[in-house]
A protein has these predicted regions:
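N-terminal Rossmann-like FAD-binding beta1-loop-alpha1 element of flavoenzymes
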Residues: 2-29
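Helical element adjacent to the flavin cofactor pocket in flavoenzyme catalytic cores
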Residues: 138-198
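C-terminal catalytic lobe of FAD-dependent flavoproteins
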Residues: 252, 261-262, 273, 277-399, ...
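Iron-sulfur (Fe-S) cluster-binding segments and ferredoxin-like electron-carrier domains
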Residues: 278, 407-417, 441-459
């Protein structure tokens, strides 16, 4: 029997796993997809929100501010890309100044540090491409940007380093208290039944399904809210220096324009409620909306330099707040984690771990190691150090992805980690091989060769993203 089973290997589930790995417990993370970071955590705005938007007194506000405060130290401990570049909420007319002032005041009572309202002259100095209609902005120096993949992988790897197990391609189909009156739960999956003393429900847009299995008397409904984005080439990455928001509305924080930690420009999202919780296809209408609304706050966005578009789903619940707590003995919800869930993840993990520790009376693990070293990036080295690295390991001299200058050595490292890459997308999210201008058109065959060699399988078994997404369907001779 496990002490804890965490359902869901997104950023919230992995944050919970990492924090719970501090304790002497047998922990398993169960994920229905083929890898970590395959749901909301892979398709979002990559923003660390300062915390001025969430309603004062809400759990969302508390954990957003705390998560943002924790992020710089966590980035150093776990070696992932993070930049506290600051954010701006742009006011486009004098009529909107009261709303901007209200946002400022909400941020102050939420405990956000350094907030101030700046006028147009200072705004233009900070952002030369700001809209001609902009009259003022809320400046939040504690806002930042992060690599959502890097953060999630770092949490997962550190959890695994401290003994947490991961089981992928395993879908939870049911759960119920153990028979005989004993404490614990049976977790039914498509690969058999597991037993545990405690469940942490971090299942993203499907967290309501698990919640309702555990507590049918108090049902929850999570709506999938889809957002479309454009990702622009590195050549557009300096169009803005900070994350630029418009004043938030009923459906969220609006269309933003932001640099990314890897030098791209990200524009989006929309906010459309959908019935299908797998509906991650972009729409023409959604992308048209991004084009139209992004230009309200930032002028001359070079959208012709877009290299891809994508859509992600947020887990929206009617109360518009995180839902975290023990709803039944040994069943802890970590549900309704929509924006600012990524920003809040470090604090969410700590809160859930504290609940579980108290419920199970866990003890600290004396040999817990809070550190993790990320994948070595030869581009970050000076020429002498890079030459020495290649001398010691020639794989770092073999460029596989030309767009992002990713080497064979980095890809091998990504595959050999725990949990490691098993698909093209797994390699892409860990190393950026395939994330550049050609969108894997050049490097995919080489990455497939390396995956097949490292995993000991034929290339015909390599997938883009697990499941039935195989790249090779047969040989030329088979089709004759």
């Amino acid at each position: 029997m496990y002490d804890i089973i965490i359902i869901g290997a997104g950023v919230s589930g992995c944050a919970c796993a990492r924090e719970l790995s501090r304790y002497d417990a047998k922990i398993l993370v169960v994920e229905k997809e083929e890898d970590v970071c395959c749901g909301t955590s892979k398709a979002n705005s990559a923003i660390v929100h300062a915390g001025y938007d969430a309603a004062h007194g809400s759990l969302m506000a508390k954990l957003n501010v705390e998560g943002s405060r924790r992020m710089p130290a966590l980035a150093k401990e776990l070696d992932f890309a993070y930049d506290r570049c600051g954010s701006l909420v742009v006011c486009l007319s004098d009529e909107d100044r009261p709303a901007l002032q209200k946002l400022y005041e909400n941020g102050i009572v939420n405990g956000v540090e350094g907030l101030r309202i700046i006028e147009r002259d200072e705004l233009v100095e900070m952002e030369p491409n700001i809209s001609d209609a902009a009259v003022a902005a809320l400046w939040a120096p504690t806002g930042g940007i992060v690599c959502p993949f890097g953060l999630t992988f770092a949490l997962a790897e550190n959890a695994a380093k401290n003994g947490v197990q991961f089981r992928f391609d395993t879908k939870v189909t049911g759960l119920h208290p153990l028979d005989g009156g004993g404490a614990g739960w049976a977790v039914e999956t498509d690969h058999g039944t597991l037993e545990t003393r405690c469940i942490v429900n971090a299942a993203g847009v499907y967290a309501d399904t698990l919640h309702n299995m555990a507590d049918a008397a108090h049902p929850m409904t999570i709506t999938a809210r889809r957002g479309d984005y454009f990702l622009l080439d590195h050549t557009a990455g300096q169009h803005v220096r900070h994350t630029v928001f418009q004043l938030p509305g009923k459906y969220g924080k609006g269309v933003l324009v932001t640099p990314t930690v890897h030098g791209n420009l990200l524009v989006g999202p929309t906010a459309i409620d959908v019935d299908d919780k797998e509906a991650t296809a972009t729409t023409a209408a959604g992308l048209d909306e991004v084009r139209e609304k992004s230009g309200l706050a930032v002028k001359d966005i070079p959208l012709r330099q877009a290299i891809t578009s994508f859509a992600g789903l947020r887990a929206h619940e009617a109360r518009h707040d995180f839902f975290i707590g023990e709803i039944a003995p040994g069943f802890v919800d970590c549900a309704a984690i929509e924006s600012p869930g990524l920003s809040s993840a470090p604090a969410i993990g700590a809160m859930v771990a504290d609940i579980v520790r108290g419920s199970l009376h866990l003890h600290n693990k004396p040999d817990f190691d809070p550190t993790r070293k990320g994948i070595l990036d030869p581009k970050a080295l000076d020429l002498a150090a890079r030459a020495e690295l290649i001398r010691q390991n020639p794989a770092y001299g073999q460029i596989i992805c030309r767009c992002e200058s990713v080497t064979e050595g980095e890809i091998i490292d990504a595959i050999r980690r725990t949990p490691g890459a098993r698909s093209l997308d797994g390699v892409k999210r860990r190393t950026r091989a395939g994330m550049g201008r050609c969108q894997a058109g050049f490097c995919s065959p080489r990455v497939m060769e390396i995956l097949a060699r490292e995993l000991g399988v034929p290339q015909s078994e390599i997938t883009k993203s697990g499941g039935a997404s195989k790249i090779i369907v047969g040989t030329n001779k088979d089709s004759l």
